[in-house]
Swiss-Prot record:
Function noted in UniProt: Specifically methylates guanosine-37 in various tRNAs.
Cellular component terms (Gene Ontology): cytosol
Annotated source species: Pseudomonas fluorescens (strain ATCC BAA-477 / NRRL B-23932 / Pf-5)
GO molecular function, one term: tRNA (guanine(37)-N1)-methyltransferase activity
One of the GO BP terms on file: tRNA N1-guanine methylation
Residues holding S-adenosyl-L-methionine: 116, 136-141
Gene transcribed to yield this protein: trmD
Protein name listed in UniProt: tRNA (guanine-N(1)-)-methyltransferase
C-alpha cells in the first residue's frame, strides 16, 4: 500500500511523466511509497468534440472550464482515493505554499489535485468540492500542472524512505525555517578558491555550528522575513551576531 495516493485531474496528464519517470519521485513510485493517477476531464465529455470549456458569462477574454466534466472526473478520483481524500485546487488565488503546509499535506493518506487551464474553472465547482486552494507564487502560469508537480515533489520528499539519506529531508532549506547553508565537494581548491577549513576538520560539532551560522546569515541577508516568524535560541542569536560582525569587518 502506498504511503500517499495522489489523484490528479488535468487536461494534460502526459505532463506528469516528469513525476513518475524521473528523479526522487520516480523512485518513490517504484518503491510503492507514492501512487500517482491522472484523470482527464475530456474522457468524461459526451459531445463529439470532447468540449471541456466554454465562454465566461458576463463576457471577457478566454474560456472557463465546465463543471460537468470536472465533476465526473472527480467522482472517479474519489472512488480511487477514498471519500476522505483532500481536494486541492492549484490556483493563484490560493494561499502560498510553504514548507509548513507541505509537512501537513505529507501526513494525508490521499490528495486529489485539480489542475485548471484557460481562465480557470467554474466557481461553482470550487464552492462545492474544493477543500483548499494553494498557489506556488505571485506570477502567472498557463495551467495548474506545474504547480501540482511542485506540490507532489515537495510532499514526496517527506515520505519516509523516499530520499537516499535519512537526514536529507530534515536538512533541506526551510525545514527549520532557515535557508540552507553552502555546500562543497571535491576538489578542495578550484580557481584559487578553497573549501572552508572547518569542513575539512572532521570536527562534527564545529561543522554543525558553522552550517547553522551560515544558514542564519543567509536567511538574514536574503529572506529576513523568515526570521520574523521564528524564535531564535540563545545560541542562534550569538551565531548570527558573530556572522554579521565578521561580515561587516571583512
Amino acid at each position: 500500500m502506498a504511503n500517499l495516493r495522489v489523484e490528479v485531474i488535468s487536461l494534460f496528464p502526459e505532463m506528469f511523466s516528469a513525476i513518475s519517470e524521473y528523479g526522487i519521485t520516480s523512485r518513490a513510485v517504484k518503491q510503492g511509497l507514492l501512487q500517482l493517477t491522472c484523470w482527464n476531464p475530456r474522457d468524461y465529455t459526451t459531445d463529439r468534440h470532447h468540449t471541456v470549456d466554454d465562454r465566461p458569462f458576463g463576457g471577457g477574454p478566454g474560456m472557463v472550464m465546465k463543471i460537468k466534466p470536472l465533476e465526473d472526473a472527480l467522482v472517479q478520483a474519489r472512488n480511487a482515493a477514498g471519500e476522505g481524500a483532500k481536494v486541492i485546487y492549484l490556483s493563484p488565488q490560493g494561499r502560498q505554499l510553504n514548507q509548513s503546509a507541505v509537512r501537513e499535506l505529507a501526513n494525508e493518506d490521499a490528495l486529489i489535485l485539480i489542475a485548471g487551464r484557460y481562465e480557470g474553472i467554474d466557481e461553482r465547482f470550487i464552492d462545492a468540492h474544493v477543500d483548499e486552494e494553494w498557489s506556488i507564487g505571485d506570477y502567472v502560469l498557463s495551467g495548474g500542472e506545474l504547480p501540482a508537480m511542485v506540490l507532489i515533489d515537495a510532499v514526496t520528499r517527506l515520505l519516509p524512505g523516499a530520499l537516499g539519506h535519512v537526514d536529507s529531508a530534515e536538512e533541506d532549506s526551510f525545514t527549520d525555517g532557515l535557508l540552507d547553508c553552502p555546500h562543497y565537494t571535491r576538489p578542495e581548491v578550484y580557481a584559487d578558491q578553497r573549501v572552508p577549513d572547518v569542513l575539512l576538520s572532521g570536527n562534527h560539532a564545529h561543522i554543525r555550528r558553522w552550517r547553522l551560522q551560515q544558514s542564519l546569515g543567509r536567511t538574514y541577508e536574503r529572506r529576513a522575513d523568515l526570521l520574523e516568524s521564528r524564535s531564535l535560541s540563545g545560541e542562534e542569536k550569538k551565531l548570527l551576531e558573530e556572522y554579521l560582525r565578521e561580515r561587516d569587518d571583512s
